[in-house]
């Protein structure tokens, strides 16, 4: 019995996320999860998702209450497999390459979170969320979960903390034990569904699993809970930056969405 209790105590939870300039979301995240999580791992890149060079914005002193738990990962290189422009490519191909490069940068930033797991043991739980996805761990006992993958079904909020978008359930945070973690981009890409065990395609798939536990009431996704200026900055530098520029929408349009 004593050995069992010791094992429970030794199992740690690592909450892992990426960062651009979302101080408000990190503050909310750290406060909600602090009592359940052993380590917060935060990765920031010196490149935006659109490929622009950027300064590092994370200041650990803004989160002094959680300083001892935070592991900060600084990424100063681009992914090696970017697609560079070639003359005479069509506009469509050029746009597709920009989108693909953005995805590669996002995955590169996510996958570098592995640097923050050096003290993690095989039985420790590793959670990944985008920073606006916050799991509710208040009723979760990880020691009783035997599934390989855990997926959190979350409530979606848009623009404001009290603007609940009830028509859509969001499957955001995903978790597994360190021994089962391949990469963080692999964990992120797992389909948010428990597939039947008799499905043959599951055997070959890297994204479809039957050994999955879905956590209902699994937390919150606070999408675009930012100032209009910060929303514009995110859209100009995010995965869909090229599409956003093409729409011709501007700061005033965004401000109208937030304030109406």
Task: Describe each PLM feature range.
Residues 9-35:
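N-proximal low-complexity "stem/linker" segments adjacent to membrane-targeting elements
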Residues 122-134:
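Short beta-strand-to-loop acidic/aromatic patch adjacent to the donor-nucleotide binding site
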Residues 1-7:
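Short, positively charged and aromatic/hydrophobic N-terminal segments
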Residues 16, 28, 111, 115, ...:
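Catalytic phosphate/metal-binding cores of nucleic-acid and nucleotide-processing enzymes, i.e., regions
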Residues 133-244:
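Conserved catalytic core of nucleotide-sugar-dependent glycosyltransferases
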Residues 26-31, 42-57:
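SAM cofactor-binding core of SAM-dependent methyltransferases
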Residues 13, 34-48, 67-71:
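Short loop->beta transition adjacent to catalytic acidic/histidine clusters or analogous donor-positioning motifs
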Residues 48-124:
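Active-site-proximal specificity loops/subdomain of glycosyltransferases
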């Amino acid at each position: 019995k004593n050995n069992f209790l010791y094992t429970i105590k030794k199992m740690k939870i690592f909450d892992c996320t990426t960062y651009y300039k979302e101080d408000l979301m990190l503050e909310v995240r750290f406060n909600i999860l602090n009592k359940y999580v052993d380590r917060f791992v935060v990765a920031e890149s010196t490149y935006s998702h659109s490929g622009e060079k950027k300064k590092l914005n994370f200041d650990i002193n803004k989160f002094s209450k959680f300083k001892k738990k935070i592991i900060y990962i600084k990424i100063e290189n681009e992914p090696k497999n970017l697609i560079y422009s070639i003359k005479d490519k069509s506009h469509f191909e050029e746009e597709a390459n920009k989108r693909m490069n953005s995805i590669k940068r996002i995955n590169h930033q996510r996958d570098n979170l592995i640097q923050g797991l050096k003290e993690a043991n095989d039985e420790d739980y590793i959670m990944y969320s985008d920073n606006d996805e916050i799991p509710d761990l208040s009723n979760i006992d990880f020691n009783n979960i035997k599934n390989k993958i855990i997926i959190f079904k979350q409530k979606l909020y848009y623009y404001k903390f009290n603007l609940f978008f009830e028509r859509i359930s969001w499957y955001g945070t995903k978790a597994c034990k360190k021994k089962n973690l391949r990469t963080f981009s692999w964990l992120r890409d797992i389909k948010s569904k428990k597939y039947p065990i008799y499905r043959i395609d599951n055997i070959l798939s890297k994204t479809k699993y039957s050994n999955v536990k879905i956590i209902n009431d699994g937390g919150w996704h606070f999408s675009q809970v930012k100032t209009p200026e910060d929303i514009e900055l995110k859209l100009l530098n995010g995965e869909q930056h090229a599409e956003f520029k093409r729409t011709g929408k501007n700061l005033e349009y965004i401000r109208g969405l937030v304030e109406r």
